[in-house]
Every structure is written in structure tokens, then in C-alpha cells.
Amino acid sequence: MAAAAAALASSPMVHLTASRLRLPRPARSPAAATPSPSPASAACCSRGAACGLEWRPKSGLRALRRCEDRLRCFSIDGGGGGGGGGGGGTGGEDGEKRGEEEAAAAAEAKVGGAVEEMRSERTRSGSFSSSSSSSSGTPGISNEPPFLSFSVDNIDTVKLLELLGPEKVDSADVKAIKEKLFGYTTFWLTREEPFGDLGEGVLFIGNLRGKREEIFAKLQQQLRELTGDKYNLFMVEEPNSEGEDPRGGPRVSFGLLRREVSEPGPTTLWQYVISLLLFLLTVFSCVELGIASKISSLPPEIVTYFTDPNATGPPPDMQLLLPFVESALPVAYGVLAIQLFHEVGHFLAAFPKKVKLSIPFFIPNFTLGTFGAITQFKSILPDKKTMFDISMAGPLAGAALSFSMFSVGLLLSSNPAGASDLVEVPSKLFQGSLLLGLVSRATLGYRAMHAATVAIHPLVIAGWCGLTTTAFNMLPVGCLDGGRALQGAFGKDALFGFGLTTYSLLGLGVLGGPLSLPWGLYVLICQRTPEKPCLNDVSDVGTWRRAALIVSVFLVVLTLIPLWDELAEDLGVGLVTSF
């Protein structure tokens, strides 16, 4: 085994560098011209590459460097002999060619025998011994892809990933920023770390020398003067910091990313097409919800024809369906109006802060009419207050309109003058929400609620669906409105803990009842990722914003928790059947 490794090392195989494999090329000297690599070297290199050999960095690189001089001397000596033979005319040239061919054949046979001996030794022992490689001073060779081994293919793959990945920060710009931006009066730099999802940026870690908002504004202005609009500077919490800043609050660091990497891309044509298709599907699902709520008023001729298997004769006139569909449209209009008002709230809050939003992508649902909409940020948020305000504006607007419809609908339901506009719904539906069930019970009374069906106004259905959809979107998870608000108020760590709790409650069916599974799948597929950090990701949102969020989450839980049977029976909400 040692003899085989020594034979392989003594041959003009390859010279390993950090980026590629190449033949050794001796430096030119004025005394003698540098010969080209001999055919023996090329033959051995191709034979070694064909074997698919890989070198272990720990034991192989040092040995290869020690063999470098030996390989170079071997190549120079072989070339010098050929050059000396060339002085004898044509016979000398023929002798040189024959000598090179013989040397190539001998070297190839020598390396081939060494490799075959290594393979047979591997078959007997199962693997190459690293100790024998170390003792002989030659690199250990393995056909297995060990964790610390590398090859030309691996290096090319890394380079390819770097080319396909996001563009990194220029080292020259980093040097200029360190020299001209940071100092003992602003931010004393101690070390640097990678920043960003793929390490495409630079995180400057050090000690702050003043008020963070003032220093951050000063650094942003100096960065624009130095590099223009090439980069974005982020102020984030220092990772793995020990304690808080002496001036109060968390210790901060500054992250640097290219503008085209850190900023969201514009809305594409395909996104507009997808948004239009989803909106049409949402309109259809809202109409279907209205039809389902008015199913009790379907013409009896149509009901008999489609439900009686013994029915004969021509089908009923479909013109009878037109009044039925028209009576179902108010529910559809109400659900769509609530969701559109929700999105208008987001845009009204984003406009004065100069934050761009994407076109909303509505999510259809046949139970509630819609699951809401996905609205993306199309510009970097300046601070956490902006994230909180924009995220909370939509749910507040939608909840205000939904509760108004729900309350007015309950009042109209208890008015005998409008009995012709009421629809019959199963009283079991009021057990789906603790908060809304109690409000309905307090408004309609025990006699109306303690029955198999309850006559309610269509506005109650629209308001109920709107409040439920708003409550789902206010859950503190991912990039939902509630998740964004929680991330702005308490940070990503709190969002991770609340998100895990929310997923658990949805999986157990504690929140949302039968809608917990489809809603949980929707969030996992489309909304699970937290929002990207703001430029100033350290600023405090204030006490009243946190208090408003806590109250909102409490109301969300009351809205999504169903009424359990014992409480529903005691309150008279529906008829509870005991088996």
C-alpha cells in the first residue's frame, strides 16, 4: 500500500490548486527555454482524472505541496533530456520522440499498476488507511465522497451557485464604508459577519457611540453621498448579543445589502392576470355563499324535480331561478364589500408613508365567501411602526364594517316588520363562535335562539363571514396581518413562539372549528414566511400599539373558539342533542 502511494506521488500526476487541476509549469529562465509538458504528464493526468480520485484536504494538501518541487524537477529533467538530444540533428529528434514515448508508456504503466494495487487493497481492507498515508508522506485517496473531501466538480458547483445567487457587496465598497462611515464618534467597528438569507451582504458589529436614531440617519446620508443608491443600510439587533446597550434597548448592528437584492421586485403582468382570475373565482364563491344561505327559498318545483327520483315530465322553467339568484346577491355583495374595504384600509395607511403595495390576490372559499387576500409590500419598510400601522389598518377597517353589518342585521332580524326579508338558517351555526354566539343570543333572545332554525337578515350572514375572515387574518403567524403586527410590536422571536402555538391550536381544531384545517394548510403554503426586516428594525412601536394588539388577539380568540355543548345548552344557543 505504501509503495503504491509512493509510486503515484512520484509520477507527474497533477498539481492541485484551490480552483482547478493543472499540469506543473516551471518558470522560464534565460539560460534554457521552458519545455512543454511531456506526454507522460498528460497521460498520467487523464488516467488520474478518469479514476475519479478525490483528495482529503487535511492529509492530502500538505503532501501535495511537498511533492510540487519533485514533480517540477521530474518535468524539467525529462524536457532537458529531449532538448539535449535535439542537438544531434534528425537522429537526435527521433531519439527524443522515442524517449518521450517510452517514458510516457512506462509512467502510464507505473501509475496504472499503482491504482490497480490500491483498488485490490481497498477490496481486501474495505477502505484506505489514513495512518499509512500520513506515515508515507503522501495524500490519502478515497473513492468515497467524504464530508471533508473535494474535487473539481464540487468547486465548479460552488462557483456556479455563486454566479446564480444574489450579487454580493463589493469588497472595495466595504473598505471605503469602514474607513469613511464608521468611527469613534458614530459606530466603533469590531468585526464583520455575513448578512442576508444567503450571506450576500455584510453585517457590521461594534459599539454604538450615541443615540441610535440620530446615528442611523447620519450613516444613511453618508452612505448615499458615498455610493449613491447602490446599497441599503439596515439597523438590526446584534445577533447573540450579551446584555443590552448601556443607553437602553438592545445592542444594534448595521447590515449592508445591494438595493436590487434587498428591495422587492415590481408586479409583473402574470401577477395581474392571476389576481384577476382569483378575483373572478372569489366573486363566484361569494355568489355561491349567498345561494347556499337562501336555499330554503328555492322554488318548490325545482326542488321536487331534482330531489324526487320518481319525478317525470319536462324540467321546470329555469326562469324561476332568476328571482332566487337575485335574492342571494345581497349576501355576496356584503362579503365582497367587507373584503374590498379591508384592502382599502391597507392602501390608505400605506399611501402617506410612501410604501408601495402589490395588487391584492383574493383567496376564494365556499364556506366564508373568501379567505381574504394576499397583499405584498413592494418597497422596504422604514421602521416597525410603519409595518404595524399598515398591517392593522386593514383588519380594523374590515372588522368595523363587518360588525356594523352584523349588528344592523341582528336588529332587523328582531323587527317583525321585516320578516319577509329573513332567511332560515340552522341554529347550530351560532355555536361556531363564542363571541358572536353570545352577541346573537343577547340580541335575539332565548326563544328565537333555542330552536332548530333561526330567522335572520342576510346582513347577519355577511357580517358573520366578514368577522370570521378578519379574525383568521389577525392570527399571529407568518406574514398574515396579525403576524406582521406582532413582528413589528414584539419582534421575530415572539412571532416564532406565537406562530407555533397558533399552528398547534389550528391542528387540534380549537380555533376555527371545521375551517381550521383548510386555513392552516393555506397559511403553511402561502403565508408562513415572516416579513423581511425594516430599515430601522430596532425602533420601539410604543405601549399603546402593543396594548391594541393584545386586545385584538384576545377578541380574535373569542371569535374563533366555538361554543361547547354545555355552555350552548345553558345559554339556549341552538338545540344540543345528547347521544
Swiss-Prot record:
Membrane topology label = Multi-pass membrane protein
- Enzyme Commission numbers on file: 3.4.24.-
User: Where is the stretch described as Disordered?
Assistant: 1-42, 78-146
> What are the Gly residues biased-composition ranges?
78-92
Q: What is one GO cellular-component annotation here?
A: chloroplast membrane
Q: Main localization of the protein? A: plastid
Q: Where is the composition biased (Low complexity)?
A: 16-42, 104-115, 125-137
GO terms under biological process: proteolysis
What UniProt keywords apply to this chain's record, in alphabetical order?
Answer: Chloroplast, Hydrolase, Membrane, Metalloprotease, Plastid, Protease, Transit peptide, Transmembrane, Transmembrane helix
Which GO molecular-function terms appear in the entry?
Answer: metallopeptidase activity
Q: Which Pfam families match?
A: Peptidase_M50 (PF02163)
FT transit peptide = 1-44
Q: Which InterPro entries match?
A: EGY1-like, Peptidase_M50
Its annotated compartments are:
Plastid, Chloroplast membrane
- Mark the transmembrane ranges: 272-292, 321-341, 357-377, 392-412, 419-439, 452-472, 505-525, 547-567
Family note:
Belongs to the peptidase M50B family.
Task: Read off the PANTHER family from this record.
Answer: ZINC METALLOPROTEASE EGY1, ZINC METALLOPROTEASE EGY1, CHLOROPLASTIC-RELATED
Q: What does this protein do?
A: Probable membrane-associated metalloprotease that may be involved in chloroplast development.
- The entry's protein name is Probable zinc metalloprotease EGY1, chloroplastic
